Amino acid sequence: MRTTIKLFLPIIIALSITSTSTAQPSGSFISEEAQESCVKYGEEYGICPEMLMAMIEKESSGRPDVESGGCKGLMQISDRWHKDRMERLGVTDIYSVDGNIHVGADYLSELFEKYCDVGIVLMVYHGEKNAATKTELSDYADWILTRSAELERMNGK
């Protein structure tokens, strides 16, 4: 029995060190750089940083190089639709972690001013048809809100 414990103990220790070294303090698996930008722009725009993190997890799985349907980067920003916003904010590289989150947070802020309701804001951001008139949350909005709440709990909020 003691021999078995001696054999498995180093493996268990190695696994626990590996799993803790890759975990982010926020509970999110996105990069530390992205988390810092979420906090920075969350504070600047009055948006919950954990919601930004949840959106990044959902939109791009935390990968800054992702492109889908013309939308690019962590928050899946369309440089076609947000060209003026990018210029106004001084963002020249939509794949830049900080720049992408800056554009996404600025757009969300605009949507919050227009719609006020977080569910509608998320559905409009996601490009859902008739989002402003829906009476129920979409699966996308529900997932973001649920994950955001989980991240907030992990951060002691």
Regions found by a protein language model. Give the residues of each.
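Catalytic glycan-binding domains that act on GlcNAc-containing polysaccharides
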Residues: 24-157
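Bacterial N-terminal signal peptides that target proteins for export
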Residues: 1-9
